[in-house]
A protein has these predicted regions:
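Non-catalytic pre-domain segments flanking phosphatase-related domains
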Residues: 2-80
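C-terminal cap/substrate-recognition subdomain and adjoining C-terminal extension
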Residues: 24-33, 40-46, 139-223
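Conserved phosphate-coordination/catalytic loops
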Residues: 46-49, 53, 108-116, 173-177
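Sec/Tat-exported extracytoplasmic proteins
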Residues: 52-66, 86, 90-94, 125-129, ...
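Surface-exposed, polar/charged faces of alpha-helical domains
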Residues: 64-71, 116, 120, 127, ...
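Structural recognition of the beta-strand scaffold that forms the well-ordered cores
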Residues: 77-81, 86-89, 131-136, 161-165, ...
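Metal-dependent phosphoesterase signature
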Residues: 87-114
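Short, acidic loop-to-helix structural element flanking the phosphoryl-transfer center
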Residues: 105-133, 140-141, 145-146
Length: 223
């Protein structure tokens, strides 16, 4: 299977080529000033739109069986990260001036709003009989699991899904290692991961997905 990790600066680069002034995504972790400028300029939203348009196209391609070809084996599965992929911590973190760790605090203390592109993608996938799996680096414990499930539901993710959280036994592992292992376990269990979407490179590294799309996030880096 081919893996395509997509940078989401297409709109930015296209605009720059015709002399339009734009705010490019600053390298993470960026300063509070740079993060706000990127957000308030509207470019962050535009880059999200570009990424999710591609994600939708990739999903359609992955589910299309060409004439004369056999349907691929395995349960078609969509993988979504949660924080700043499915739910946005921006408003909450902004109130804390984006201090290091603020997004993580927000994730387990606030009901975060849905990122529309992700919610729409999830609804579309489920409608097409694709299994939805959230893989998050949020730590696995009863309290945080219940809080996360409630937040997802309140934000609009009411469809059937599986939530995979980081077990305490692998707490020292990087997010990349944990998430790669989680995807491989799904495949071993019969899944065919058609699309993987995340805001961190660690959400996508390790492959095991037919298509992968990376969203912009200048606020922090998870390895």
């Amino acid at each position: 299977m081919s893996l395509r990790v997509t940078a989401v600066l297409t709109a930015v680069l296209a605009a720059a080529s015709v002399g339009v002034a734009v705010a490019e995504e600053p390298a993470a972790p960026a300063s509070a000033t740079a993060i706000r400028a990127y957000h308030d300029s509207g470019e962050w939203a535009k880059d999200f739109t570009t990424a999710f348009k591609l994600a939708n196209k990739d999903l359609d391609k992955a589910l299309t069986v060409k004439k004369g070809k056999k349907k691929p084996k395995g349960t078609p599965t969509l993988i979504l990260d949660i924080d700043d992929t499915s739910l946005s911590s921006y408003d909450c973190a902004a109130k804390k001036d984006f201090i290091p760790g603020s997004n993580g605090i927000c994730a387990v203390t606030e009901n975060l709003p849905a990122i529309k592109g992700a919610l729409d993608l999830a609804k579309k996938a489920v409608k097409k009989k694709v299994k939805l799996v959230f893989i998050t680096a949020r730590p696995e414990n009863e309290t945080i699991r219940a809080f996360t499930e409630k937040n997802l539901k309140v934000a609009g993710y009411t469809m059937k899904h599986t939530l995979t959280m980081k077990p305490s036994g692998v707490a020292a592992e990087t997010s990349a290692a944990y998430k790669t292992a989680a995807r491989k376990a799904l495949i071993k269990g019969g899944a065919r991961i058609v699309l993987n979407v995340g805001d961190q490179q660690s959400d996508l590294s390790g492959g095991a997905a037919q298509y992968a799309v990376k969203l912009p996030n200048p606020m922090y880096v998870n390895k």
